[in-house]
């Protein structure tokens, strides 16, 4: 598990056209919001991507880039994002090398299935039109997600690891908390406008 101010793992992944992209190129000019999805049948992933698409203008206006990493092949990722993440840069990691590098593990049965919070989230997502589907061949149904903010020095200033598969950070946290914090400086917490640090 990666921690605050730790160096972000820098890997080369493929975009939906099969072009190799090094992650450090994405955060070299401006801070990066890096989101890892689960599998393509996951309702919570579809909902998360929908929120990123909806909030993209505000996120980019605040000075952050956005990149999404999936388990799919470039071809499968292209089809998936054309429906659920139009306009977002999505990268393929079918070997899940980046998932491992960022400390994203396989969830247990209580994080992925036998959890009332997951059941409630699936029900809410279904009402929004996001259907639960089995993972495509080669994608791990137990893979956990994660969201990271990486500054231009390549440091992780916000690592978010899910407690369960429905635990993606709400858009309000990203827009009101994360984006109101000055990521050009070393992060010492807390996040949000007007937040005061605890005295030591």
List PLM regions with ranges.
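Cysteine/selenocysteine-centered motifs that mediate thiol-based redox chemistry or coordinate metal-sulfur cofactors
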Residues: 184-200
């Amino acid at each position: 598990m990666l921690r605050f101010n730790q160096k972000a793992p820098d890997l080369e992944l493929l975009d939906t056209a099969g072009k190799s992209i090094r992650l450090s190129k994405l955060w070299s000019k401006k801070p990066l919001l890096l989101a890892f999805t689960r599998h393509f049948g996951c309702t919570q992933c579809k909902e998360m991507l929908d929120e990123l698409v909806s909030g993209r203008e505000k996120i980019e206006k605040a000075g952050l880039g956005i990149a999404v990493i999936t388990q799919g092949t470039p071809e499968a990722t292209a089809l998936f994002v054309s429906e659920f993440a139009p306009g977002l840069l999505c990268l393929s990691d079918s070997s899940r090398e980046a998932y491992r590098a960022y400390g994203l593990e396989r969830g247990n049965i209580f994080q992925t299935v036998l959890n009332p919070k997951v059941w409630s989230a699936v029900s809410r997502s279904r009402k929004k039109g996001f259907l639960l589907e089995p993972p495509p061949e080669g994608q791990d149904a137990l893979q956990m997600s994660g969201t990271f903010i990486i500054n231009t020095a390549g440091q992780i200033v916000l690592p978010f690891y899910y407690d369960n598969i429905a635990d993606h950070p709400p858009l309000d946290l990203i827009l009101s908390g994360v984006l109101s914090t000055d990521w050009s400086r070393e992060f010492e917490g807390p996040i949000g406008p007007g937040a005061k640090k605890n005295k030591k």
